[in-house]
From Swiss-Prot:
InterPro entries: Ribosomal_bS6, Ribosomal_bS6_sf, Ribosomal_S6_plastid/chlpt, Transl_elong_EF1B/ribsomal_bS6. CDD domains: bS6. It comes from the Bacteria. GO terms for biological process: translation. NCBIfam families: S6 (TIGR00166). This is Small ribosomal subunit protein bS6. Pfam families: Ribosomal_S6. Belongs to the bacterial ribosomal protein bS6 family. One of its GO terms (cellular component) is small ribosomal subunit. The lineage of its organism: Bacteria, Pseudomonadati, Pseudomonadota, Gammaproteobacteria, Enterobacterales. GO terms for molecular function: small ribosomal subunit rRNA binding; structural constituent of ribosome. Keywords: Ribonucleoprotein, Ribosomal protein, RNA-binding, rRNA-binding. Binds together with bS18 to 16S ribosomal RNA.
Amino acid sequence: MRHYEIILMINPEKNKKIFIIIEEYNKLIHMYKGIIHRFEDWGKRSLSYTIKNLKKAHYFLMNIEVSSECIKELENSFKFNINIIRYFILTRTKAHKKISPILKNKEENKKELNSSVIKINKNIKKK
């Protein structure tokens, strides 16, 4: 089994189907006795240019360890799923389990925002 990193860009207008789609791919990976080392939901993000008349996409990142047969099956499924705007499959030498910089920055921004709100609330209470 080899290590892969997969980035999926899914049509954000299919909100209800997004997690059903992801669950299908998780089942497929487990059916081939694969391992999901990291799964991240990056949420909706703006695209640099329109793709299939869309300006945003819902992004997901997966680091998995699977057989080449499973990757072929996943890639075939990605190609024929009309809800998937784009996909990238990269071969990796080892499993990546750390939080990605994109998600890390998102969490740090939330913490900064929360601390700012707390400071503002404290200042309002003092007055």
